[in-house]
Amino acid sequence: MQQYLDLMKHILAEGVDKSDRTGTGTRSVFGYQMRFDLSKGFPLVTTKKCHMRSIIHELLWFLKGDTNIAYLRENKVSIWDEWADENGDLGPVYGAQWRSWPTQSGDAIDQIAQVIAQIKSQPDSRRLIVSAWNVGELDKMALAPCHAFFQFYVADGKLSCQLYQRSCDVFLGLPFNIASYALLTMMVAQQCDLALGDFVWTGGDTHLYSNHMEQTALQLSREPRQLPTMTILRKPASIFDYQFEDFELTHYDPHPHIKAPVAV
């Protein structure tokens, strides 16, 4: 994935040094876009090994509407541990907003079910949108949504998706985010009987943490390898019925994992 390495180079060359909420410090650019043709391979970074099992389980957890890390812990996924309270709760984060956005009347909107119904019935709609950025509930969330807003687009029988990520940890978080939304696009396309188009990633505050610079240099020294293939082995009755075993990643030959600290 040369696009990802090019982003790192751009931040190092053009970025500005900024303070941040975690106190770690970043080198940051504002506004960046990458496009991945999903018909040409699954966009999983190859210049370091990425933990696809965690990515899949996290996405399934979002789609369940779950906001407690018990499911993740059961499946040996620890990426949310630092933000959960003593009971494993995170407040109304992604899953809650995707599946049960509260309304003034006391009802809840299932944005995922709604957008899939809209794609099927009104594929040319410009309102094929899901938002996790609920201003009225931000103060209840353990972490405000970083990948905040995504939109689907149908053309020539193909489904594309664009994500707006307001804040992006490029070294640790971004490979997960790209793979997660690429997989979500594949799932929605399958449910709507559409071919695969592009995944477009758009970043706001796009940064490398100051304690990731050595790791970034190591990654930039490596040559990207051929993208792997992701296969969905069955088509379940709905977007909410996928299981971990439904996904098969093949031809993934990454460089070794690179460890880096998480800024909390």
UniProtKB/Swiss-Prot annotation:
Give one Pfam family: Thymidylat_synt
Similarity section: Belongs to the thymidylate synthase family. Bacterial-type ThyA subfamily.
Keywords of the record, alphabetical order, are: Cytoplasm, Methyltransferase, Nucleotide biosynthesis, Transferase
Q: Which residue positions are annotated as catalytic?
A: C146 (nucleophile)
- Family matches, as HAMAP family: Thymidy_synth_bact
Subcellular locations according to the entry:
Cytoplasm
Instruction: Please tell me where (6R)-5,10-methylene-5,6,7,8-tetrahydrofolate binds in this chain.
Output: H51, D169, A263
Q: What is its main location?
A: cytoplasm
Please give the start and end residues of each transmembrane region.
Answer: none
Kindly state a single biological-process term from the GO annotations of this entry: dTTP biosynthetic process
What PROSITE patterns does this protein map onto? THYMIDYLATE_SYNTHASE
Q: What is said about its interaction partners and assembly?
A: Homodimer.
| Function, in words | Catalyzes the reductive methylation of 2'-deoxyuridine-5'-monophosphate (dUMP) to 2'-deoxythymidine-5'-monophosphate (dTMP) while utilizing 5,10-methylenetetrahydrofolate (mTHF) as the methyl donor and reductant in the reaction, yielding dihydrofolate (DHF) as a by-product. This enzymatic reaction provides an intracellular de novo source of dTMP, an essential precursor for DNA biosynthesis.
Domain of life where this protein originates: Bacteria
The residues listed in the UniProt record as binding dUMP, with positions renumbered to this chain, are R21, R126, R127, R166, S167, C168, D169, N177, H207, L208, Y209
Cellular component GO terms, alphabetically? cytosol
What this protein catalyses is: dUMP + (6R)-5,10-methylene-5,6,7,8-tetrahydrofolate = 7,8-dihydrofolate + dTMP
Q: What name does this protein carry?
A: Thymidylate synthase
- Pathway, per record: Pyrimidine metabolism; dTTP biosynthesis
